[in-house]
Amino acid sequence: MRVIPSCGYDSLPSDIGTFFSIKQLNKPIKKVEVFHSAAGGASGGTIESIFSMGKLPKEMRDPFVLNPKDTVSDIQRKESQDSLSIRWVKEAKKWSGIGLFSVANTRVVRRSAALMELNQNPYGKNFVFKEYGAYSSRRAAIFTSLGLILSFLIISSPLKRLVRRFLPQPGEGPSEEVREKGWFRGIFITEAEDGERQVTSIYGDGDPGYK
């Protein structure tokens, strides 16, 4: 038996969506940005995984922690730092903010890009990937992003033991109604090295984590 990590909602839509978007332009790519939105629930197992992230070593804060050795340029490291960006994205017709799984997804996509380059099929010289949440209003982007920052601070502190007991436990999950009414969408903005830009999207019906 093999365990294949990062093959669910985190991080397949980001990884496959980036690969697909780049293939559509079929030329060297400078940058891909994705803006994710979704509706659904969280199981106790997922919440337990999120809370366990508070134990991760400082090395996990490295945007290229999953990359093979010597596959990161100075330009890539400068342009790929985790950041809070609240702005109107006209191509997506959404406001950007922090994405719930962006810390995990960005590392996976950057690793895939590095492996493609090692296989003599690079996405582009100094390729940069960034991920954000997509929100309907500036207020939603600000308050959700602040809520996520607060959540990350809690799971890194002793307070997490107090908060954890009030959330779903392992074995518990979203109801059938929540799973049926769920959905997800990712909007990818791809910029080629020659300046051409293209917008692609990936979407699905049903809870992205459990259907």
Language model feature labels by segment:
Residues 1-5:
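Beta-strand-loop-alpha-helix segment that lines the small-molecule cofactor/substrate pocket
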Residues 8-14, 39-40:
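Gly/Ser/Thr-rich loops at beta-strand to alpha-helix junctions
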Residues 14-24:
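Active-site-proximal alpha-helical scaffold in enzymes
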